[in-house]
Amino acid sequence: MYILEISLKFTPMPVSVQRKEAEAAQAAYQQVVEALRSGQPSVLELHCEFQAEKKLAVLTSGIASVQLYEKSGGSATVKRPGFAVIGE
């Protein structure tokens, strides 16, 4: 399972959709990146393959960042990419 996570400006929690296949996840990622590169505000619509009823529409001018990562198969938790703080 692949997770496409979109961080929105002025919003502390990201929004995300899931894809089952790597190719579909990469295509969705490229769709978001191309929308950002265009520089023109538009509505970007995405859907989740894991939860069919989950749909997402965002204004591209409100996107701060996008990341794509793979969810571990055997674990219920997801380790997001980036830095992690480990307590003593």
From Swiss-Prot:
Question: Which InterPro entries does this one have?
Answer: UPF0367
Highest taxon, organism lineage:
Bacteria
Q: Report the sequence similarity comment from the record.
A: Belongs to the UPF0367 family.
Note the HAMAP family from the entry. UPF0367 (MF_01360)
Name used for this protein in its record: UPF0367 protein syc2447_c
